[in-house]
């Protein structure tokens, strides 16, 4: 297939996924998955974020609803039945969009869970701001980052860009 055909197919797949997410609740939260994604992107826009950061905010949870649930291990209702090759929704989403978006956007989507782990490590009070569902998925995503991992991550030039969407997401 042509690149245009592949792009059209991917766009259709994402639009179908977003349409399906319009009716599904976001975990145990009082909002749908679609509303959650749109809200995060809108907060990014209102904060003056650049286009790539806004796109990453829109797509940060695409791995939750655009693929077979057995591929994902970090949702409370899917954790038990996840297959042996299951990944977190952040990795699934980043892998899904990587061929179609700038590298930074895919990296920001991939860092979505690690940004939560990082913030819990450097700001102990941040954990208290998380919903019960987000606290639960934190344990599935590796828990609070170790000091060694924090030290390694702080050297990344896009760390601040990964943390901003995390705060808008909560």
What are these regions (language model features)?
Residues 170:
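Charged phosphate-binding loop/patch that engages nucleotide di/tri-phosphates or the phosphate backbone
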Residues 15-39, 72-79:
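Active-site flanking loop/helix segments enriched in acidic
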Residues 5, 28-31, 84:
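Short N-terminal micro-motifs specific to bacterial/archaeal maturation
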Residues 3-18:
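Acidic, glycine/proline-rich low-complexity segments that act as flexible tails and inter-domain linkers
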Residues 1-2, 150:
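N-terminal amphipathic/basic-hydrophobic helices that include classical n-h-c signal peptides
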Residues 43-167:
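Divalent metal-dependent catalytic cores for phosphoryl transfer on phosphate-bearing substrates
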